Amino acid sequence: MTGDQPPEPLRIGVLGAARIAALAIVDPARTTGDRLVAVAARDRHRAEAFAATHGVERVLDSYAEVVADPEVEVVYNPLANGLHGPWNLAAIAAARHVLTEKPSASNATEAREARDAATAAGVTFLEGFHYLFHPVTRRLHELLATGELGQLRRVEVDMVIPAPADDDPRWSLDLAGGATMDLGCYSLHAHRMLAPWAGGPPRVVAARGGERAGRPGVDEWLDADLEFPGGATGSARCNMAGEGVRMTCRVVGDRGEATAANFALPTMDDRVTITLPGGRRVEHLGTRPTYTYQLEALRAHLRDGAPLPIDADDALANMELIDACYHAAGFQPRPRVSRVGRRGSPGRPG
């Protein structure tokens, strides 16, 4: 790129016609000017409707065709949790960069395979923790980095949503469902991102969880107690059958504390409340979508070499912490899908 010439648009291929795609990739691409060059879904009619509604350039017959399409340089994967790992690996094998919805895999073993493959292929692997790119989270980190809150002592992150429909794949063990996979991944990731001010990443001390009625092995809620090397403690809570929506992050230091009212989706509430000995103030950090910041960061990385704050190693570390929470709470880590057809239909879990 020279002078004022804008960077070349990213060429993005979309796997599936999931609802999240409109929020997480379609709207951001409209803002950034990046191209949605191809989409495929298990039902071609759904893919055609998605393309017509959202301006995707071409409809292909299968996920495999999207991954292999020479026009696609970035594969966006918003499929059900259990299909993240297999199709991320397929995209990496085709030398495509990957932007995957979280969690990046069904378990740490699968995440390690993706990390190793991405490293060997030299491709970018970004797990979609979009909140990390927003000024709300950057402000929380800044308050610790500048010492305004003092030494980190306590972190509390709550992720709560009302229950999805009974047939939602987030309740399917075979598709790597559960509250910790859908919501707790944020709670744990937010803790892990505080490692620079906590002496290192946290470990699980204890965890408790409740099983969804009629869904053996699937957690409806899970609370994890964490501890950092520097002595700070944490509470990572998630509930996928709660009352209302709550996505708060509270950071407590020995000089003060700060709470983000909705760190995961600040478009809904961008307040950060800072409490210090001299009083309390509320800062509004802006409701621009987190997903737009994320796509801008990915483009800056791929076009200009700007660093990203997370990579495939981070995705593996987060899955390792998720698996540790499951073990501590008496659950098994999620099984992986053993076979996936060209259109993305799962085989029996392995």
Predicted regions and their residues:
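N-terminal Rossmann-like dinucleotide-binding module
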Residues: 1-54
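C-terminal helix-rich "cap/oligomerization" subdomain common to oxidoreductases
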Residues: 1-9, 74-76, 229, 300-350
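Hydrophobic residues in well-ordered beta-strands that form the structural core
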Residues: 60, 100, 125-127, 260
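A contiguous active-site-proximal alpha/beta segment in oxidoreductase catalytic domains
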Residues: 82, 105-164
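NAD(P)-dinucleotide binding in Rossmann-like oxidoreductases
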Residues: 215-219, 229-293, 311
